[in-house]
Amino acid sequence: MTNLLNNWLIINQFGYDLPEPWQLGLQDAAHPVMEEIIFFHDQVMFILIIIITTVLWLIVKALSGKAYHRYLVDGTLLEIIWTIVPAIILILIAFPSLKLLYLMDEVMDPALTIKAIGHQWYWSYEYSDYQTETLEFDSYMVPTSELNKGDFRLLEVDNRLVVPINTHVRVLVTGADVLHSFAVPALAVKMDAIPGRLNQTGFFIKRPGIFYGQCSEICGANHSFMPIVIEAVSLDKYINWVLSGSDE
């Protein structure tokens, strides 16, 4: 219990966004689309609870009641009701779902473009929007034996993907060898990295923090050992990071 409490304090104090022990809900949203997804999830769960409660009540009432129609074989009004009501419920669920699908695919006028390339078993990133030479680096998982106090096992990397907050970021995703998947739950990002094909996704991070993800496509023996870490910082810190990276 002490370890769980310490992990919870570390996660909340330093702004880390990753799954928590015994977590039942979704991660805190840092991207407007993720906020919409959580809201839609809550709506669907509310509808589901109402349906389950109603059906259970009808079952209990039917089994416990003494009055029943032994020879009732049809009821036009009843059939109309149980056809129309589910149809309306499905429509109410479908329209917000379609809206979210389009929002997740739309990349709005990006101010920054990053290329993420999946390898067996690490990620490489390229920043090519600047007049200087392309800023590129590889990102490997930090082995358990080299973790520092407060680091997270199987989630830490040696080089984080650094982006500015309040900025539309586009990520071009591809694979160098086999299928991979670039996924960061807190940002509602999941895009397949396919060799020979360039896919795109985007996000708009609203607050500083460190956001953890992983490859979400089985890609070989070390599939579980290629995490993704995105560090969102202020624009000034991001510019300093770019300048320091360009000088190296």
Curated annotation (Swiss-Prot):
Reactions catalysed according to its record: 4 Fe(II)-[cytochrome c] + O2 + 8 H(+)(in) = 4 Fe(III)-[cytochrome c] + 2 H2O + 4 H(+)(out)
GO terms for MF: copper ion binding; cytochrome-c oxidase activity
One record GO biological process: ATP synthesis coupled electron transport
Residue ranges, Mitochondrial matrix side: 66-79
CDD domains reported in the protein's UniProt record: CcO_II_C
Keywords, comma-separated and alphabetical: Copper, Electron transport, Magnesium, Membrane, Metal-binding, Mitochondrion, Mitochondrion inner membrane, Respiratory chain, Translocase, Transmembrane, Transmembrane helix, Transport
Record flagged with keyword Mitochondrion: yes
Mitochondrial intermembrane membrane side: 1-43, 100-248
Binding site for Cu cation A2: C215, E217, C219, H223
Enzyme class at the top of the EC tree: translocase
UniProt-annotated location(s): Mitochondrion inner membrane
Annotated residues for binding of Cu cation A1: H180, C215, C219, M226
Pfam families the record matches: COX2, COX2_TM
Cofactor: how and how many bound: Binds a dinuclear copper A center per subunit.
Membrane-spanning parts: 44-65, 80-99
Cofactor: Cu cation
Membrane topology (UniProt): Multi-pass membrane protein
GO cellular component: mitochondrial inner membrane
Principal place of residence: mitochondrion
Binding residues annotated for Mg(2+), in chain numbering: E217
Similarity comment: Belongs to the cytochrome c oxidase subunit 2 family.
Classification via PANTHER family: CYTOCHROME C OXIDASE SUBUNIT 2, CYTOCHROME C OXIDASE, SUBUNIT II
Subunit structure: Component of the cytochrome c oxidase (complex IV, CIV), a multisubunit enzyme composed of a catalytic core of 3 subunits and several supernumerary subunits. The complex exists as a monomer or a dimer and forms supercomplexes (SCs) in the inner mitochondrial membrane with ubiquinol-cytochrome c oxidoreductase (cytochrome b-c1 complex, complex III, CIII).
The protein's role, per its UniProt record: Component of the cytochrome c oxidase, the last enzyme in the mitochondrial electron transport chain which drives oxidative phosphorylation. The respiratory chain contains 3 multisubunit complexes succinate dehydrogenase (complex II, CII), ubiquinol-cytochrome c oxidoreductase (cytochrome b-c1 complex, complex III, CIII) and cytochrome c oxidase (complex IV, CIV), that cooperate to transfer electrons derived from NADH and succinate to molecular oxygen, creating an electrochemical gradient over the inner membrane that drives transmembrane transport and the ATP synthase.
Protein name, UniProt field: Cytochrome c oxidase subunit 2
Gene name tied to this protein: COII
